[in-house]
């Protein structure tokens, strides 16, 4: 593992990015969480409803907890990756910031701000992105989906990404208020990026919070976007993700 900067633990909110299927990235997160001893853990991978099912005594039985959360139907990688992070801070209250699929699907019909609900303006959701950022985000969505998506749906894909960013920011803010912090946020690199992801929206809504952002690269490739710190780990052997679109 190569570290681009020394870890920092004086923050209110520590955002920890990942490539979801990279085991080394989750090992880094678990180590950082153990060192940080956060009062709260916020997961992109859990909806608020799922997080409410978890009580501290349930962390010991990984398989039972996975069944309780219906993890196998969630589409996320091996639950063990995230269970190791939960057990690294057994004292932490667990929050879910994931946007339910039904809500994400409704963005195209109902609009970004309406789906988010109260406080949308605080997180910039009532304003359009500037043209350059909108174009850059649409290009990233196209690339992430192997240029297989119709161009007409790319704006909605960007709106869903913004919705997920804002949901993460809102939940981190709530966790900070309810627990006093520190708060660790576990999410993908795309949501963790400081320039336009969850940290940017959180800083907009709660400028007094001190935020540190960790991005995780693979081999010598940094993640897209800007971060306070980048850690590099080997990329796992994986099939070509574009095979699914062929």
Over which residues does each language-model region extend?
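Generic beta-sheet signal
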Residues: 12-14, 39, 181-187
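C-terminal regions of proteins
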Residues: 167-176, 184, 191-246
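Short internal beta-strands
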Residues: 40-46, 212-216
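A substrate-binding/cap region within the structured catalytic cores of diverse enzymes
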Residues: 54-175
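Zymogen propeptides
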Residues: 9-37
């Amino acid at each position: 593992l190569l570290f681009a900067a020394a870890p920092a633990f004086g923050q209110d909110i520590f955002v920890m990015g990942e490539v979801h299927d990279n085991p080394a990235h989750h090992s880094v997160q678990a180590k950082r969480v153990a060192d940080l001893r956060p009062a709260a853990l916020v997961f992109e991978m859990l909806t608020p409803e799922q997080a409410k099912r978890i009580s501290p005594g349930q962390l010991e039985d990984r398989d039972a907890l996975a069944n309780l959360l219906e993890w196998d139907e969630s589409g996320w990688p091996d639950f063990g990756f995230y269970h190791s992070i939960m057990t690294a801070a057994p004292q932490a209250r667990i929050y879910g910031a994931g946007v339910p699929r039904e809500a994400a699907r409704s963005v195209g019909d109902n609009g970004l701000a309406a789906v988010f609900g109260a406080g949308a303006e605080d997180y910039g959701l009532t304003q359009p992105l500037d043209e350059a950022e909108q174009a850059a985000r649409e290009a990233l969505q196209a690339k992430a989906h192997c240029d297989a998506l119709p161009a007409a749906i790319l704006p909605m894909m960007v709106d869903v990404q913004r919705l997920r960013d804002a949901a993460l920011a809102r939940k981190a803010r709530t966790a900070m208020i309810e627990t006093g912090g520190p708060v660790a946020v576990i999410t993908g690199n795309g949501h963790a990026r400081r320039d336009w992801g969850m940290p940017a929206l959180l800083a907009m809504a709660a400028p007094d919070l001190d935020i540190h952002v960790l991005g995780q690269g693979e081999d010598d490739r940094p993640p897209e976007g800007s971060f306070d710190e980048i850690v590099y780990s080997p990329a796992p052997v994986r099939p070509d993700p574009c095979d699914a679109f062929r």
